[in-house]
């Protein structure tokens, strides 16, 4: 199945060279990463020794953090340049991460049905709003999750607040992201995400909102999911 938006891929191909620059195009992800790693570790009861799949891994910011926490990480993405950056950075960091250029739908087809081929933890961060068919991604994640595994999705709510903060604020005013990184109509309401998860036989255990203070450059979590949010599912 071709669940790819080439325009979206091209955006991230162009930004690949700055992926690991903490003050570059991915500065917001670098700032957010410690918070989301801590959340994932807490809800997954630690990552050490666990088999983890990072879907839409890009240049590997979260993949590396999870590997440093002791996880056995596989990262998949359909971009070329960001994956090259991810492989090089992991090697320079002395980390072993299995990066593969594939869609998750094709990855599922190449896995066997046995329990050993499935994952304890699956992460899909800031990716669902960049694909034509989010449900297909969710169903594929479910197929790869162990019965006692934990799955995490993060995305952006389709609200006026999110439009003002993520597009106008982050892209045009603060210039933290390149203009055109996000398209408002592709943002996903929590009810839509939960409906797709229900169709995939996944149950939401918790949902939290990400929030950012541009003065302190700090992120925090609370129950307000009107902008960026993360969901934990089983």
Curated annotation (Swiss-Prot):
What are the record keywords, sorted? Methyltransferase, S-adenosyl-L-methionine, Transferase, Ubiquinone biosynthesis
Q: Taxonomic classification, please?
A: Bacteria, Pseudomonadati, Pseudomonadota, Gammaproteobacteria, Pasteurellales
Q: Which reaction does it catalyse?
A: a 3-demethylubiquinol + S-adenosyl-L-methionine = a ubiquinol + S-adenosyl-L-homocysteine + H(+); a 3-(all-trans-polyprenyl)benzene-1,2-diol + S-adenosyl-L-methionine = a 2-methoxy-6-(all-trans-polyprenyl)phenol + S-adenosyl-L-homocysteine + H(+)
Pathway(s) of this molecule: Cofactor biosynthesis; ubiquinone biosynthesis
UniProt family annotation: Belongs to the methyltransferase superfamily. UbiG/COQ3 family.
Identify the EC number(s): 2.1.1.222, 2.1.1.64
Named from the GO MF annotations, one term is:
polyprenyldihydroxybenzoate methyltransferase activity
Q: Name one Pfam family in it.
A: Methyltransf_23
Q: What's the source species for this entry?
A: Actinobacillus pleuropneumoniae serotype 7 (strain AP76)
GO BP annotation list: methylation
InterPro entries the record matches = SAM-dependent_MTases_sf, UbiG_MeTrfase
User: Gene encoding it?
Assistant: ubiG
UniProt name for this protein: Ubiquinone biosynthesis O-methyltransferase
């Amino acid at each position: 199945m071709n669940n790819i938006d080439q325009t979206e891929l091209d955006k991230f191909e162009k930004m690949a060279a700055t992926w690991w620059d903490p003050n570059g195009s991915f500065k917001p992800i670098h700032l957010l990463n410690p918070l989301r790693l801590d959340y994932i570790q807490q809800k997954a009861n630690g990552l050490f020794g666990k088999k983890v799949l990072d879907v839409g891994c890009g240049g590997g910011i979260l993949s590396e953090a999870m590997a440093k926490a002791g996880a056995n990480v596989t990262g998949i993405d359909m971009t070329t340049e960001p994956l090259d950056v991810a492989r090089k950075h992991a090697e320079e960091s002395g980390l072993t991460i299995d990066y593969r250029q594939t869609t998750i739908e094709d990855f599922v087809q190449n896995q066997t049905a046995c329990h050993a081929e499935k994952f304890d933890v699956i992460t899909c961060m800031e990716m669902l709003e960049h694909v034509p068919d989010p449900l297909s991604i969710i169903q594929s994640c479910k197929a790869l999750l162990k019965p006692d595994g934990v799955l995490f999705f993060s995305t952006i709510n389709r609200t006026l607040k999110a439009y003002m903060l993520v597009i106008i604020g982050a892209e045009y005013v603060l210039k933290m992201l390149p203009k055109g990184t996000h398209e408002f109509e592709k943002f996903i309401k929590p009810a839509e995400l939960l409906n797709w998860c229900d169709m995939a036989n996944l149950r939401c255990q918790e949902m939290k909102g990400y929030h950012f203070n541009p003065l302190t450059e700090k992120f925090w979590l609370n129950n307000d999911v009107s902008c960026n949010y993360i969901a934990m599912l089983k």
